[in-house]
């Protein structure tokens, strides 16, 4: 039986599984898996440059919506919520279920295929230009995002600094392991 998102049981089970994966999975972690998201969260929480650039009154989350890409082992949509707050505080970066997406009208939802997210992470696609060109679909107030260009660019820069292995760099065996991991975690934690 899957855990119910937002409950203490969910939180406890998710954190336990996350700690097991951090301890047991080989590094570099695969980008967008929970253990990598935790590394990214910690990095952003301690990044002085991001804190310096962040807007003092920012109270918005950014939801990264990654659409399915079976060729990379991704059979389901994944939603990653970056809970960002005043002066560069990063409260968390983690998976959320689709049912939670858009509940807060201040949240920004950016949707793209995983290969577009690879391009963003590798600095081959500027996140703001990508939104303006329709390569990344934004749901939210574009003028507010445009005001936050510098912190947004810094967030993208941190992806490369955290490091990790992109799904298009995986061997066929690693791709199948990635697929199995996602196909196990999402239903178990009520994320599909």
For each of these PLM feature ranges, what is it?
Residues 1-192:
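Feature captures hydrophobic
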């Amino acid at each position: 039986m899957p855990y119910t998102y937002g409950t203490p049981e969910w939180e406890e089970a998710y954190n336990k599984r996350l700690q097991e994966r951090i301890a047991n999975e080989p590094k570099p972690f695969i980008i967008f898996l929970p253990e990598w998201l935790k590394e990214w969260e910690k990095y952003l929480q301690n990044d002085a440059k991001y804190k310096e650039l962040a807007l003092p009154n920012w109270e918005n989350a950014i939801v990264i919506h990654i659409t399915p890409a079976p060729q990379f082992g991704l059979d389901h949509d994944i939603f990653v919520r970056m809970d960002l707050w005043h002066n560069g505080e990063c409260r968390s970066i983690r998976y959320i279920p689709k049912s939670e997406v858009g509940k807060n009208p201040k949240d920004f939802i950016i949707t793209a295929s995983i290969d577009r997210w690879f391009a963003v992470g590798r600095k081959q696609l500027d996140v703001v230009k990508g939104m303006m060109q329709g390569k990344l679909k934004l749901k939210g107030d574009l003028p507010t995002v445009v005001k936050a260009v510098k912190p947004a660019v810094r967030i993208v820069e941190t992806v490369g600094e955290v490091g990790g292995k992109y799904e298009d760099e995986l061997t066929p065996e690693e791709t199948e392991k990635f697929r199995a991991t996602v196909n196990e975690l999402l239903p178990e934690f009520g994320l599909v």
